[in-house]
Amino acid sequence: MHVLLSKKIARFLLISFVFVLALMVTINHPKTKQMSEQYVTPYLPKSLQPIAKISAEEQRRIQSEQEEAELKQSLEGEAIRNATVNAIKEKIKSYGGNETTLGFMVPSYINHRGSPPKACFVSLITERDSMTQILQSIDEVQVKFNKNFAYPWVFISQGELDGMKQEMIRQAITDSMNGDPELINIKFAEIPADEWVYPEWIDENKAAESLISLANVPDGDSRAVRYQARYFAGFFWRHPVLDEFDWYWRVDPGIKLYCDIDHDLFRWMQDEGKVFGFTLSMSEAKEANEKIWDVTKKFAKDFPKFISENNFKSFITKKDSEDFNNCEFTSNFEIGNLNFYRSPAYRKFFNYIDEEGGIFYWKWSDSIIHTIGLSMLLPKDKIHFFENIGFHYDKYNNCPLNDDIWNQYNCNCDQGNDFTFRSGSCGGHYFDIMKKDKPEGWDRLP
């Protein structure tokens, strides 16, 4: 019995030895190692994977290449910065220095490695504006344009905007950007109280009389409209909340956009060297603009250095004379360079106009002040009419008459309601001065 058991144990040990020996041979076979590295290693955590051995010489080579690449990048960055600074200096010099209007604006037209323009939407909210109108205008701009570009919004309000209204605005913009927080940039600010009152040199009794005498002019009896006109003409661009921006797009409560805008308008303005873009123009009531042209001519005589040689005075004067024609770029849609208003020339012009008191003694609007300033202080080719943007405000419409444009941008407006070439508009006058071809059918509108 014991002998039989010993034989079984010996046989078991022999078989086990042979199995272990075969297993060791298999594990150490080259093909087995290759399969192990191919199928097992990739699934190991990085901390457990074998670290490739690099020779000291190879390590020095890699480090040297990294240092060389970093140095090259640093030198390229410095070269680009130096080239940019030199380009700015040369451009400013070519315009006659940074005291000139164009010279002052040069830095805002320089692209830094393809970075987008420093631009934003500006919406002024007064006590007269409803949240329905405000949210409508936000939705129009976000859906038709900004969902593709994510430019910031700046809301400047008359008094503090309460938390509920701010949240409604945030939610409207957030929803249009699919809730992506990285694409949402909203700023709220207040109009300084001293910029929404009569300035100290205004005779308030005389100003009150104009509210009565101009009651037959749209908003002619409104003091608030005059405060707003003065603020937009001379102060909104000074607000610290806009200091970081070069470009603005004014968005008034209640506006509508009729066409899709698939290209970056800010980038286009910057790349084309434009300063101001508009969609609607019209002739303002003569009674509202009493004496403003006389003051403008006096300014031009006192400060001839600010008047552009190739200016756009022909847009604001009659074809057969130097008389003022009351044409204005309607301010409910503006895309412009903030640095134009910040320039020494426009500051001087606005102060000159403001001290005359015509904003309150008559009804000089921000539209007419902007228009005269732009037309006198800039070359005419810096001002652009956006004929491919369908726009609506109040009872006025800009609807592209060019069928190709109308179809390309999915416009949903009635071309028969376009105001550009109608009586009371200055659109036809603009086309004539700029020698632009008018779209087919422009003369068949009532």
From Swiss-Prot:
Q: Name one Pfam family in it.
A: Glyco_transf_15
Give the GO molecular function terms. alpha-1,2-mannosyltransferase activity; mannosylphosphate transferase activity
Q: Where is this region: Stem region?
A: 30-114
EC nos: 2.4.1.-
Chain intervals for the UniProt region annotation (Catalytic): 115-446
* Gene3D superfamilies found in the cross-reference section: Spore Coat Polysaccharide Biosynthesis Protein SpsA, Chain A
Which protein, by its recorded name, is this?
Mannosyltransferase KTR6
Q: What species is this protein from? A: Saccharomyces cerevisiae (strain ATCC 204508 / S288c) (Baker's yeast)
- Gene that produces this protein: KTR6
